[in-house]
């Protein structure tokens, strides 16, 4: 059966699950822009419980696509000194973070989520912007293999934490 463009313009979509918590989408680049409609179409969720938080300014695009939907839009840069406070404003135990951003340290965010009972899906394993790969002297320590090992070791401290999923493949790269 062929799918036509009109099939994507449906007014009603099948709902696959209900989520009563809050969802924080960090980043509103290509992945954030793609995931928000999926959430709104296929989850039973109050749109007021969904927040998009980003450093860049895609507000005009957000308003064009989601004005009146009830979804919250916040422009704020997440840094090593403010991430706990800023993220804590929008999610707590039982809630979900979808991190589709760049330059937010995956290990820091995962540890915060584990400590606070927040589920997380992360598109990639990033480091803080001020700590790029080039600042790491040993080449082997710059690899994803090494970073995965660091993440696994850190998560051993939280054997019963909420579900955390990293590098799930939705990172479009450059």
Specify the residue positions occupied by each region the protein language model found.
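Glycine/serine-rich phosphate-binding loop and adjoining beta1-alpha1 elements at the start
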Residues: 1-18, 54
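Conserved N-terminal Rossmann-fold NAD(P)-binding element of oxidoreductases
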Residues: 24-29
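Hydrophobic/small residue at the entry helix of a nucleotide-binding pocket
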Residues: 31-34
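NAD(P)-binding Rossmann-fold cofactor-contacting core
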Residues: 44-65
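Rossmann-fold cofactor-recognition segment
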Residues: 67-80
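N-terminal glycine-rich "phosphate-gripper" loop used for MgATP/nucleotide binding
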Residues: 78, 98-106
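Conserved Rossmann-fold cofactor-binding substructure of NAD(P)-dependent oxidoreductases
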Residues: 78-91
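Rossmann-fold NAD(P)-binding glycine/threonine-rich loop
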Residues: 107-115, 123-160
